């Protein structure tokens, strides 16, 4: 398996740079929301939506999250690249989706992401 090739093929090109916010991820999530997999499960202190995205039908459940610390966007980019692989309808993605259900909170701390800080707005 050529990991460099996989990385290049499934990298979400719209997520780049150091700062990743809800404004960056919402268009991608909404594009992928073909079967009501995207849910708003809460709101931040400042009123920003906190999303959950579910994909797969397997009995093994995996919980994924990113940006608990708002200034750590690298994990969000990696998470979206992985979710993009799951969208690919390849033999690998179908095997993963048949065996696992992935529950994702793509940005746990949207306020911190907007302010580019580790803390949330709850002071």
Where do the model's predicted regions map?
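Structured catalytic-domain cores with a bias toward divalent-metal coordination
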Residues: 1-123
């Amino acid at each position: 398996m050529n990991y460099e090739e996989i990385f290049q093929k499934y990298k979400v090109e719209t997520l780049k740079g150091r700062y990743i916010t809800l404004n960056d991820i919402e268009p991608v999530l909404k594009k992928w929301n073909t079967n009501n997999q995207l849910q708003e499960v809460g709101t931040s202190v400042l009123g920003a939506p906190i999303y959950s995205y579910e994909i797969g039908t397997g009995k093994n459940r995996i919980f994924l999250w990113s940006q608990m610390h708002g200034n750590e966007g690298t994990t969000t980019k990696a998470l979206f690249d992985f979710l993009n692989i799951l969208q690919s309808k390849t033999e690998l993605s179908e095997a993963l989706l048949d065996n696992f259900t992935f529950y994702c909170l793509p940005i746990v701390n949207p306020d911190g992401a907007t302010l580019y800080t580790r803390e949330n707005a709850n002071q």
